[in-house]
């Protein structure tokens, strides 16, 4: 019964989460062709500005997704689930919401790196995340190493942790790696530019 409850919570929570997340993530995919065009034209310094604006967009979309996942009443009203399952599904979405801003910022790095022909970095980070995901699931789902036993909610907790780890590693690499310096991502501060954001 416990295993069935975990499956129900994860299935419902993941369905709601990915429905919202993928819709918002699709907006950020526009960075890749924009940056790739600038890369092909050797206009490297301009790529940094596009990345900074995309990061602002990711923050805004992340805030919207964060709010939707923490107040999922419209979605729950459609499910008509037993109260116990609904409560746990809300817990799953609450835990997952913490990782959304980091996951979207990582997608900006993903699109940027892909555009400038550096996909290996992204692949390496994804593999690191996958390697961490399995033991973290065991820790949070089944209460290992002194952690509370969270069941399906623990899967969302581990996903949020990995999202932040991946995001921090990605942008630290972008800051430190010599191969990224010519794009001037960290050369200066940029406030949101409505014209550029509309273009993205």
What are the functions of these language-model segments?
Residues 95, 99-104, 126-134:
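Transmembrane alpha-helical segments of multi-pass small-molecule transport proteins
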Residues 2-15, 89-93, 156:
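Small-residue hotspots at the loop-to-helix junctions and early N-terminal turns
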Residues 58, 112-139, 153-160:
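Alpha-helical transmembrane segments of multi-pass membrane transporters/permeases
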Residues 1-9, 76-83, 139-150:
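Helix-terminus/linker motif at the lipid-water interface of multi-pass membrane proteins
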Residues 26, 66, 130-131, 135, ...:
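Hydrophobic/small/kink-forming positions within alpha-helical transmembrane segments
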Residues 35-101, 147-200:
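Short alpha-helical transmembrane segments in multi-pass integral membrane proteins
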Residues 9-66, 70, 103-122:
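Small-residue-rich hydrophobic transmembrane alpha-helices
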Residues 74, 108-112, 135-142, 171:
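Alpha-helical transmembrane segments of multipass membrane proteins
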């Amino acid at each position: 019964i416990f295993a069935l409850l975990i499956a129900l919570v994860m299935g419902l929570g993941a369905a709601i989460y990915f429905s919202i997340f993928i819709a918002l993530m699709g907006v950020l995919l526009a960075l890749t062709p924009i940056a790739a065009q600038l890369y092909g034209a050797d206009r490297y310094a301009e790529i940094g500005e596009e990345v900074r604006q995309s990061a602002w967009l990711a923050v805004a979309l992340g805030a919207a997704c964060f709010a939707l996942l923490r107040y999922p009443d419209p979605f729950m009203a459609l499910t008509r689930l037993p109260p116990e399952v609904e409560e746990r599904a809300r817990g799953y979405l609450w835990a997952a919401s913490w990782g959304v801003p980091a996951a979207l910022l990582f997608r900006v790095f993903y699109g940027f790196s892909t555009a400038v022909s550096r996909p290996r970095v992204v692949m390496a980070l994804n593999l690191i995340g996958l390697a961490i995901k399995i033991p973290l699931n065991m820790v949070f789902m089944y209460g290992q190493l002194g952690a509370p036993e969270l069941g399906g909610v623990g899967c969302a907790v581990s996903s949020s942790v990995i999202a932040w780890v991946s995001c921090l590693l990605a942008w630290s690499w972008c800051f430190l790696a010599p191969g990224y310096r010519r794009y001037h991502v960290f050369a200066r501060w940029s406030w949101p530019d409505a014209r550029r954001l509309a273009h993205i």
